[in-house]
Amino acid sequence: MKVILLQTDICWADPAANVAYMDKLISAHAQGTDLFVLPEMFSTGFCTSPEGIAESSDSATLRWMKQKAAERNCAIAGSVSVEENGKFYNRF
């Protein structure tokens, strides 16, 4: 099993920029990789006020993770700040 751990600088509270950068990294290392492990809260960075950064459980970030994993025939793991029923979670 080939596992790649990705660690990067995060563009604070900018999911589009962070996902685009992760997309480039995954594409560059996709050959033969079975699992990519992304940094914790890779799409936004940490924040003491999750109200401003939390995503829905069907966010563009999570859809991207599923799509990229299907395209590359691999697994992608990483956590995202998610809001559900008025509560906030660091969901892995």
Located regions from the model:
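Active-site-proximal beta-strand elements of phosphoester/diester hydrolases
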Residues: 1-10, 14, 91
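Cys-nucleophile CN-hydrolase/nitrilase-fold catalytic domain and related Cys-dependent amidase chemistry
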Residues: 15, 24-91
